[in-house]
């Protein structure tokens, strides 16, 4: 793939005509610098040029923007450092859920349901939101362990037990749902999102009448990105959480339940 070198060539012409102080570069990662786990050789050469291996021996500021996620910016920066054979700082990384930091002030002390993100290591996805400053983060694993019949098709994984928050959810009033990253269990996560959007005062296991639901605004739900598709090393693009995939599936189920 030749995207990276073409980008670099344009960048050097820009820097020579406008000066270094006005130039910075933002890279996408998936499909541009990497193809699945494979780092493109052109990408490594481009990063080296930005690090000063260029005719002017000058560094050019750059950052990475990706709709990937599921780990902290610091961990992602370490991974990218290994990939591109240079030091990448955490503040050079903007992931799908980095934007959720902007909601910290509003929901810092509010109970929120986090959906999606890697299940391993257990509790790691919750830890990312907590590192942003959210203090009451609950997961689908927590709800499933609290009431196994709420999603009877699978059992809560024993490997998740050390990371579970075991609380009485009849006393928790959820205020928002965060789709942190791509769901690993669409059926369960759609079920719980619809449950909370139809719940009385955000209490899991309660339900308003359809008339009350139609009169009220549903619980806020925030998606970390809007991708329908994303690419990896498989030959066909994969469905994401955004427009047309998980979100549309959730909206369709909620619409049917609200009108029923």
Predicted regions and their residues:
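HAD-like aspartate-dependent phosphatase fold
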Residues: 2-260
């Amino acid at each position: 793939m030749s995207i990276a070198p073409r980008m670099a060539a344009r960048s050097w012409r820009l820097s020579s005509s406008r000066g270094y102080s006005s130039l910075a570069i933002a890279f996408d990662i998936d499909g541009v610098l990497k193809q699945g786990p494979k780092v493109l050789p052109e990408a490594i050469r481009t990063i080296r040029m930005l690090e000063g291996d260029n005719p002017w021996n000058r560094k050019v500021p750059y950052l990475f923007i990706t709709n990937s996620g599921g780990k902290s910016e610091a961990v992602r920066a370490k991974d990218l450092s290994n990939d591109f054979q240079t030091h990448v700082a955490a503040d050079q990384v903007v992931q799908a859920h980095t934007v959720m930091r902007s909601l910290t002030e509003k929901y810092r002390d509010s109970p929120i349901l986090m959906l999606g993100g890697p299940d391993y290591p257990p509790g790691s996805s919750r830890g990312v939101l907590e590192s942003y400053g959210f203090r009451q983060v609950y997961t689908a694993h927590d709800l499933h362990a609290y009431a196994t019949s709420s999603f009877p098709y699978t059992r809560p994984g024993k490997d998740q037990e050390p990371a579970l928050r075991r609380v009485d959810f009849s006393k928790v009033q959820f205020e928002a749902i965060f789709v942190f990253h791509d769901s690993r269990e669409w059926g369960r996560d759609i079920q719980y999102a619809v449950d909370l959007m139809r719940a009385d005062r955000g209490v899991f296991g309660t339900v308003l009448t359809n008339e009350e639901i139609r009169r009220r605004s549903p619980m806020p739900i925030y998606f970390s990105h809007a991708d329908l598709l994303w690419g990896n090393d498989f030959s066909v693009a994969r469905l994401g959480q955004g427009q047309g995939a998980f979100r549309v599936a959730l909206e369709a189920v909620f619409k049917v339940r609200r009108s029923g």
